[in-house]
Amino acid sequence: MLFRSGEGDEEEALLARGANFQVPLYSCLAGFVEPGENLEQAVAREVFEEVGITVRDVTYVASQPWPFPNSLMLGFTARYGSGDLVLDEKEILDAKWCRRDELPMIPGSISIARKLIDLWMMRG
């Protein structure tokens, strides 16, 4: 989950709608680690590839086994570094910075993405 300071220093989170989502669901960015990368590098690369943003302060939060495709999901937070939203339209239909009081439809409680969103909500 990616954060930045918004208007009046109110924190905002970046949520995205994946190209494969059947419903208008917004979630955290996600991806896979490539050979030769550490986890922090993978987070930075995936964010940049999907939305054109650089990140800083990448921090591990939690993990979750995921049955498809037999993966281990790793949840991280990161702070906005620089850049404007430039979407990889093959993977991302939409992305937006959201305040806590304006969340779109988000994943259900069983997902690690929801855990990251809930932790962010509790911090506010």
Predicted feature locations:
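Nudix hydrolase/Nudix homology domain
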Residues: Q22-Y26, D88-G124
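Conserved Nudix-box catalytic region and its N-terminal flanking loop in Nudix hydrolases
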Residues: G6-E49, T54, A62-P65, P69-N70, ...
